[in-house]
Swiss-Prot record:
Family: Belongs to the U1 small nuclear ribonucleoprotein C family.
Chain segments carrying region Disordered: 61-99
Matching InterPro entries: Matrin/U1-C_Znf_C2H2 (IPR000690), Matrin/U1-like-C_Znf_C2H2 (IPR003604), U1-CZ_Znf_C2H2 (IPR013085), U1_snRNP-C (IPR017340), Znf_C2H2_sf (IPR036236)
Name of the featured protein: U1 small nuclear ribonucleoprotein C
Subunit structure: Component of the U1 snRNP. The U1 snRNP is composed of the U1 snRNA and the 7 core Sm proteins snrpb, snrpd1, snrpd2, snrpd3, snrpe, snrpf and snrpg that assemble in a heptameric protein ring on the Sm site of the small nuclear RNA to form the core snRNP, and at least 3 U1 snRNP-specific proteins snrnp70/U1-70K, snrpa/U1-A and snrpc/U1-C. snrpc/U1-C interacts with U1 snRNA and the 5' splice-site region of the pre-mRNA.
Amino acid sequence: MPKFYCDYCDTYLTHDSPSVRKTHCSGRKHKENVKDYYQKWMEEQAQSLIDKTTAAFQQGKIPPTPFPGAPPPGGSLLPHPSIGGPPRPGMLPAPPMGGPPMMPMMGPPPHAMMPGGPGPGMRPPMGGPMQMMPGPHMMRPPARPMMPAVRPGMVRPDR
């Protein structure tokens, strides 16, 4: 009778039957071995990706990513209009702090776009306040209570 070999545990089981395999596979030691195997596999995959990316970068296939705040290549960095000083000719004035930008000749934004929440179709910033998502806890109760199905000839408990 052939024996069952477990690659994760590097061991042979006493005999090849579904009940022995099921018992072995539900054991603590087997589960730890499986977890360790896939953990090592993921680490190898990540290291392989890092090595490939590093090699491509060193060969010049991947351009260096500019750091935030670094001047763009071949140009000078102009100060942002909101960093003090009067607006330059041809530029709109800086938006008020804490509010959305206003377009010229349009007046203030509608109430839905006031500070304190994102406007319609906009997401809150990363790390900002989380909005509640509708879910089972926010659903309305049924319009009428659900009654058990009654077969013809059976007596309903409420009558």
